[in-house]
């Protein structure tokens, strides 16, 4: 009983029963179909994305990148706020034209060919923003896996990326142990403790993703159990997921994974990272903001981020968790807006 060993049976049974009789799949499909979907072919790699045009003629282009276990759907409310700020009490001068791509292997973006030689995701995003959409300057935001993509955009293309806004940061390389502060040591210890207690999923997805994928691709109940445990644990919900995610939202997320058969391919970034199939991190020189939500997986101190990034803004949020764009779109949207206001 309870959630200590994983997804609680009673909670899962209730969701499964609603999924089978009560959940209006057609209504959710209609909502998804009404979104501004686009598709690009980037040198043979198809990429799905949403485009929300900014309400100002000089709106700054902004690419938002989701993480795991997320989809484009999680970013819709945030994107709307950023594209049309006057509808939410803001100024049209702060508008962005917002691009929300689906990561390769997630929902409507098929998995890339095995790496190498396929282009890494951040290079696909740069092609999307420049060659496909014609942007010469653009901004970027991401959390979780999306923070990694956004970091690499800032590192690789400072000539085009005006700044990056992150919900997580990469660990610095070649840290002198003698330079680590007490606050940084406490942070690293907290991360290690979290991994020991809650990181089993990550180890499995890093090491044997295909084996796990067979089971989750064969059972919608198993897939839902794998996802909902993370949604409950990683939100600022005090154990009551319905405070943050409605049943319809949870089941629509699960349905997107199920009907596009993408759960196995969504593990691919973990496998690639574990095998060094990513470009190494060097110092990111573009202006960087970090927003730290108290119920996210980790809360890096400012000094830790400053080791690898040109950090010009650091915000400790009063509430919110790992899925900040859906949990707290106003808090996150305001922080993004304020950060990029002087970088336009």
Residue ranges and their predicted role:
Residues 114-132:
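Alpha/beta-hydrolase active-site loop
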Residues 1-58, 249, 258, 265-279:
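Non-catalytic accessory segments flanking enzyme active sites
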Residues 69, 104-107, 171, 321:
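Alpha/beta-hydrolase active-site loop signature
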Residues 68-80:
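The serine-hydrolase catalytic nucleophile loop
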Residues 59-67:
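Short beta-strand element of the alpha/beta-hydrolase
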